[in-house]
């Protein structure tokens, strides 16, 4: 992200890609939900109180007070610029829970998560849902969450992916809800955004952009040659370019839904012991693999070959993102791995071992200097090319028998911490919701849970998976199948 004036910064190509890909069938929303125990509060949070609470915290992220500004004809990458008309009433909302129980809460949060973000304003929203209870069903059935409070408030933070990735979300949540009562000041509004200045600068930089693009293509081409050589000699292993398609790889309908399961830590550790050397992430991938395999089998839709997952790997540390401050050069720091889920292997422990081996190979490939250099070709791509690539996604055919590289997404975000508070209300649980899109109608997010367990949320198309309860049960059963061999031998 290049600085072009006080308070005005230009998006990095990796972040601008989310702007250019935005459509009704390809949203780039990031959503995280925090549940707080408000059973000791005398009265629920009101909207004026919520607005005052948020006003004190606006200095924690540039996106809270800045909006996207696109250059006419996309002659250059978009900019973040201060929004002089920013009104907190457009961003902070308070509403009561529509009904007791987990299912009504899911529906209420799903509507919030799937609604488009207004990119003519700072691209974020914060919704508070008061009077939440999970008493009737759902989470109460999980032993680890059997002690949920009788009254909670859900804080639903939503923002555009161009402003940050999953790790940035975790860090921002810690700043907003952390115990520190001191908050940075809101930046003073600098000079106004000038479209004419941006166009003039873009036209003047066109020769430099063309030269940078040529050099980027040459560097990426050289890196691709080295990759082919290292694949040939076995130094790295390329993942399969195509996978058999399944119901979750079709165009999505209009209804997003999600669900959540809490998986017990003792079973995760037992599964690790059953396959010596397996990591927690390996166990989670194998758990999802087993559930997906069984779910498709029950629909009489077992694929001809193994399915694979897109697994983002964080590259944090290469630069600061928007959530860290307005001067950061990049908001998104991710490499996208394609991990074989080995859904064609019947034995659960054998499948876990195979997934562990595939994950290690993909991590090795993704960290390879030539692979990373090849991926950096986007850094020199002109804005117009990124825009055309983004628009092309809307016309992609998803009716074929195969898909490119992966069938589902499995992401992992570390636990935000035990000391988060909403006013004086302590945190009970946090989970995220990943946006679905055409060709990717089932996505999973793993969050280390408070206490001894791991929370797995999954978002899907209600038409593709009308029975999320069944998939939740299959996730539990899949982990139990992985843990049983260790219990049988007394590990």
Segments from the language model and where they lie:
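Soluble acyl-CoA-dependent acyltransferase catalytic core bearing the H(X)4D motif
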Residues: 2-14, 33-44, 51-441, 447-454, ...
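Basic/hydrophobic alpha-helical interface regions
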Residues: 18-19
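TRNA-binding/sensing appendages of the translation machinery
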Residues: 26-30, 48
